[in-house]
């Protein structure tokens, strides 16, 4: 009996993912604090050979009570949420740690918080979940892939989005909270930020009465290359905050 052909020898190193890393600076636009640094975020996005992608982010808000958040959020090859981890401290004290898992017809959460203790949640979904808000600024731009760019100026609605916290700073929980989302595509623009100059897409998150406190209008710019990398954000109203990509490092396989 003939011997089976030997399997081809694979190289010892396997580097078939592509990665990008960056820093988002948080500043104030209030007149009495104009351009004062009020926080920062360090993120990394890895896209694997099978098309799945994961964002890890460390987020810091210095405004009292300070917020520190660490997240790990993954999508499948079709940009559908699969799972997320969120750990949260407020005022330098532990608030909660939670793990979220998304199925085709329900979402679940296992969390431990300083207020509620150990909590298990299950939330039914009418359709598979399209997007999840974990409050990392880098991930805000990932919602925008759902918006039709052939309808500029029109309010478009994402019927269901789950949050890890309904608080504007994401400073509660983490636990599941369901809302819809209203977004306008403003249009393509050329944009220069601290990290460089980009072909960008401009969107605006508009009024949403489903939150316990209505969020002010939020403008977001992201890359126009299909990766939806966050470039800049501006929140109006009582918040008057600014978010800007100031550092960007692409791995060797990411592309230009």
Which role does the model predict for each range below?
Residues 2-113, 158-256:
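Acidic, serine/threonine-rich low-complexity disordered tracts
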């Amino acid at each position: 009996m003939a011997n089976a052909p030997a399997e081809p020898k694979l190289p010892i190193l396997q580097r078939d993912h592509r990665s990008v890393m960056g820093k988002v600076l948080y500043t104030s636009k209030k007149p009495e604090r104009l351009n004062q640094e009020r926080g920062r975020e360090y993120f990394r996005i890895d896209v694997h050979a099978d098309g799945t992608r994961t964002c890890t982010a460390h987020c810091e808000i210095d405004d009292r009570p300070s917020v520190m958040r660490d997240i790990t959020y993954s999508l499948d090859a079709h940009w559908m949420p699969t799972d997320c981890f969120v750990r949260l401290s407020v005022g330098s004290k532990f608030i909660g740690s939670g793990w979220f898992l998304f199925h085709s017809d329900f979402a679940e959460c296992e969390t431990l918080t300083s207020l509620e203790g150990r909590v298990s949640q299950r939330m039914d979904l009418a359709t598979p979940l399209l997007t999840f808000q974990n409050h990392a600024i880098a991930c805000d731009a990932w919602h925008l892939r759902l918006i039709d760019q052939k309808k500029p100026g029109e309010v478009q609605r994402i019927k269901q989005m789950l949050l890890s916290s309904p608080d504007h700073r994401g400073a509660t929980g983490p636990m599941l909270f369901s809302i819809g989302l209203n977004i306008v595509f403003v249009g393509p623009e050329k944009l220069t930020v601290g990290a460089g100059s980009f072909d960008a897409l401009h969107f605006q998150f508009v009024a949403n009465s489903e939150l316990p406190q209505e969020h002010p209008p939020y403008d977001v710019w992201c890359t126009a290359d299909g990766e939806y990398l966050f470039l800049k954000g501006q929140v109006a109203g009582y918040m008057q905050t600014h978010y800007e990509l100031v550092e960007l490092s692409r791995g060797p396989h990411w592309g230009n």
